Amino acid sequence: MTWTHLPLGNKTSRFTQSALALMIAGTLPAYAGTFNPRFLEDVPGIDQHVDLSMYESNKAEHLPGKYRVSVVVNEKKMESRTLEFKAATEAQRAKMGESLVPCLSRVQLEDMGVRIDSFPALKMAPPEACVAFDDIIPQAASHFDFADQTLIMSFPQAAMKQTARGTVPESQWDEGVNALLVDYNFSGSNASYDAHDSETSYNSDSYYLNLRSGMNLGAWRLRNYSTWTRNDGNNTWDNIGTSLSRAIVPLKSQLTLGDTSTAGDIFDSVQMRGVQLTSDEEMLPDSQRGFAPVIRGIAKSNAEVTVEQNNYVIYRTFVQPGAFEINDLYPTSNSGDLTVTIKESDGSEQKFVQPFSSVALLQREGHLKYSLSAGEYRAGNYNSAEPKFGQLDAMYGLPYGFTVYGGAIFSDDYYSLAGGLGKNFGYIGAISIDVTQAKSKLANEENSEGQSYRFLYSKSFNSGTDFRLLGYKYSTSGYYTFQEATDVRSDADSSYSQYHKRSQIQGNVTQQLGAWGSVYFNVTQQDYWNDEGKQRSLNAGYNGRIGRVNYSVAYTWTKSPEWDESDRLLSFSMSIPLGRVWSNYHLTTDQHGRTNQQLGVSGTALEDHNLNYSVQEGYGSNGVGNSGSVNLDYQGGVGSASLGYNYNRDGQQVNYGLRGGVIAHSEGITLSQPLGESMAIISAPGARGAHVINNGGVEVDWMGNAVVPYLTPYRETEVSLRSDSLNNQVDLDTASVNVVPTRGAIVRARFDTRVGYRVLMNLTQANGKAVPFGATATLLDTTKESSSIVGEDGQLYISGMPEKGALQVNWGKDQAQQCRVAFTLPEQQDNTGVVMANAVCR
């Protein structure tokens, strides 16, 4: 029940007195012991017989009913929820000094962390029935802070489950609603080239569509990942994979059927089609969880960056001149080299390979992380055999900071066994060492046997130095990974038969320099048997700030055996804030002394800052000449759109993109920004146009729905609407809802809205007198709940009112202290959307 106390207009001091009295009466229980109704005796127009007992004491007469309250359990804040409160018994009043006590069921107490099994009376109680928890659990108590609408619960520690920090009870995990969904990302470009030093001229068109579609049915998630590419009239459609998955909560695991990839902690990850059961560490609280690649590079001009893995294009974006960073990849497997192509505006390309494998993490004592996979190897776009195989990976935390791990791969023509040991050495860092023995049957029935040795080290120092990964791996000439051996069997002339991996080293170091900024250093090297060359790359940079001016210096060096010379690029960037606009300067130079400079502005626009724009103008040496670009990126409630134009001496290009999602569910079809893995559908009937907090551009649509994307699975997330964005005929009982989605879930965040008119009504009795101050008025409507309190001179402000209806008015328990108002609202409104009305209470 919602009580609304609002001043009703500019009145005399007589009205001010009564309004002040009402506010004191409504708030007094939070601060004082009693409220004396004699305070109102000298206020003209107040019926001295009105029943104001509900305001007389903070220990007494708040009305029983349902209230939306914040919940605090043993000083830990939990999610807000609607709870029923009952009038306290005399024994409860004496014990806790409370007028209202919460009506809590066994299930609700368990959600709060109470150890139900320790109390037979709780264990035997019906799941949804109110229980006398304060009698059953010694020293248990509750306090309802009515003014703050907060329920404070206190239980002895022995009565509580021993849970890790950050634990969200499994009973709150929400599998979501049944729905169909599509997450799409489309990009295109149209270019025309007219080389200044030749007679060559041509047009080039390129399009790319990334689709992640699926269906949720209960706990099951059906997903398909497909891409479409069109380059200069040549179409390619790739069905990358289809899978059916669900959470296995008792095992803290994820079951997947169909296309997936094996774990990459011990062996190199490969794509497969079959069945997999793997630990899901997202189900663990943050305090018990113990590497996604970041790609850095430098673009000399407005460039297109493409990332491929396993011969699939998994990412494409357009970047401006200078150093760039890509940190939001979704690789198709947990390891596998990433091929990065930077296509400059003049058509030239830079290419480098970034080795990628996930870090073998140490496990907490007693924690088992595992993965079981069985099925058929998938070669992706490569022409290779697809043998059946099984793989097991396991890591277990031992005492004293040790972790033991191992695994096995079995196939008709291949087997591999691995074992290793990791140790957390505290100040020294974390180290792991493992060895893998493999035997392969290659082409022409040739057998090959060998070993691979791996060393990993990671450490963060108090000085701000962070070794995220320092690793070395060496393989003997007879060692083949499962993927290498399979490809060699498929093609005796494969490069793997002569050139397979020999050693690999990679390191990532970041050093924080406090007020002086930070530096980073990334290096990788990879070489192959029977090949003298080495594949190497180095990235280094410095980020700093002087006053409000940000600047950075970056250097990249890449070398591949098939290249005659290495690629070297040096860049400098500087940004100066000018309100909501930034002035930017970029400079890049390569090993041949060719220099490119760009000067421009960028910023955001619109109320939610959801329109990004940039304008750049540049000049290149060595005859490159002038260049420039204009880019817009809009993030709307139903999707995102981008548009860009750039030119140089050899031509011009227009690029554009659309990103978003569509969800079909029981309450409509809702368009969205890109969806991510887990998401929430807001349901707020009648609240069209309401803005979602912390989600720029997202608004409730005409059906009362909106999508909040990119929720973290198994983590509590608060979804909130901006009250000031509601129209004049909508009120919310609460402006925020907490949700806890499981992996891939589409959860419902339901807001209770009161849709109707805001009314300022002058109420008189049949005898012509005003309805007494302090009387309660309740809407008689089975579909709506709206109540308020009558002010001085019979003035009533109430929201959520229909055009026609009836109000029940009470100011006491006698029949003479009750009446009913039948009303039909007039059309006139003031400038705040409030309807003015007069009515007789009979």
Curated annotation (Swiss-Prot):
**Entry keyword annotation includes Transport:** yes
Q: Which GO terms describe its biological process?
A: pilus assembly
Q: Which N-terminal residues, if any, form the signal peptide?
A: 1-21
| Record flagged with keyword Transport | yes
Disulfide bond residue pairs:
C819-C841
Q: Gene3D superfamilies from the entry?
A: 2.60.40.2070, 2.60.40.3110, 3.10.20.410, Outer membrane usher protein FimD, plug domain
Superkingdom per UniProt: Bacteria
SUPFAM superfamilies given in the database record: FimD N-terminal domain-like
Q: Which UniProt keywords apply?
A: Cell outer membrane, Disulfide bond, Fimbrium biogenesis, Membrane, Signal, Transmembrane, Transmembrane beta strand, Transport
Instruction: Please give the GO cellular component terms listed in this UniProt entry.
Output: cell outer membrane
Places the protein is found: Cell outer membrane
GO MF annotation terms: fimbrial usher porin activity
A Pfam family: PapC_C
The principal location of this protein is membrane
- Give the membrane topology, semicolon-separated if more than one: Multi-pass membrane protein
Q: Which family does it belong to?
A: Belongs to the fimbrial export usher family.
> What is the documented function of this protein?
Involved in the export and assembly of LpfA fimbrial subunits across the outer membrane.
- State what protein this is by name: Outer membrane usher protein LpfC
